[in-house]
Amino acid sequence: AYKGIFFGTRSVLQGLVARGDALTINKGEARDYAKYEYRKFMLNVARKYMPMWYLKDFVKYASWYKFTDIQVHLNDTSYNGHSRFRLESDIPGLTATDGYYTKGEYRDFQYYAEDYGIRIVSEFDTPAHSAVFIDNNSELGFDGTHLDIRLNSDKKETVYKFIADLYEEYMGGDNPVFVTDAFNVGLDEYNSAYKEDMTQYTQYVMDLVYNKYGKTPMAWASMGCVDSDKTKIPDYPIMDAWANYAISLKSLFNQDYKLINATNKYGYIVPGGNNGYPDFAKEEEMYNNLSAGKFRDKMGAGVDVAEGHPKIVGGSISLWNDRGIFNGISVYDVFARTQSILPIYAQTFWYGKDNDKSYDQFKAEVNTLGT
């Protein structure tokens, strides 16, 4: 397949770079294949707009380290009323006025990324993190940030229709805006008092994505995904497991769906720092402790399983930009905080944890490869 061939060229090119001025590479047969299917990076462009040139440059950088996916977080609730939707939309008043992507350029961007072996996973984060939708139409809201999906609410059907129409605008028709075979439905951080309501909503959006639009649903693993040890949703989604306080990480391994290790112990970066997350990653600690089988959140809670566990399909880093619009962070500052952690995740979720190589040795090798 194209992606495998492309990643093979990265291996050859990296081998040449490592040889310095020799411009030769050893003759023979090489086998270089990933231990896990996905290496993903989530960019929150809703809280801080990132121009298209930056997204394209980031694709090229991530592809050098054989990342497979870039998730683009297109809407979010933010601070000081700064909630944004970053796509051109047919819905009056929804599109951000301080930076957005036209449908055409976003469609072209996905094809551009495919040339570099990268799949773009677009995300609409609902039913929480939805202030931008509620600000535009108050009939959708349970409060200022949560869509009203309560089973006994008069607004429920309005919300469900809104979501169906929103999905159709970007995934329907003969020339859809979202062209890749996966879509992230969000599901992050809804009020935990409404588990059954959330479960039904989860079933609804995943059915639309999978059965109507033929895409693999991806989501943040949160309440509503499981009920004790008995699944209530289908087995085809891929879940980002991020925090034990959002859902029992141990319970996820009793379900049928696949898991991406997106735990916030090492996988969350917030430029400027916020809510206990670092401004810059502790890279040496990350290198020494990151493991595909360690599902531990920033509080240390969670579960450890063996590397290579059949339910683990990859790892993910998330750049949240909680305060990015207010603390003067530029896209160059964002890159400075992410540049050196991509190789660590690439190593961990391609080859696996290397206990025989010190961080200093690893860093020297990365510096040799350059960008």
Q: Model features per residue range: what roles?
A:
Residues 231-237, 244-371:
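Flexible, acidic glycine-rich loops studded with aromatic residues
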Residues 79-82, 129-132, 193-195, 227-229, ...:
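Extracytoplasmic/secreted cell-surface and envelope-processing proteins
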Residues 46, 75-79, 123-129, 188-190, ...:
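Active-site beta-loop-alpha junctions enriched in small/polar residues
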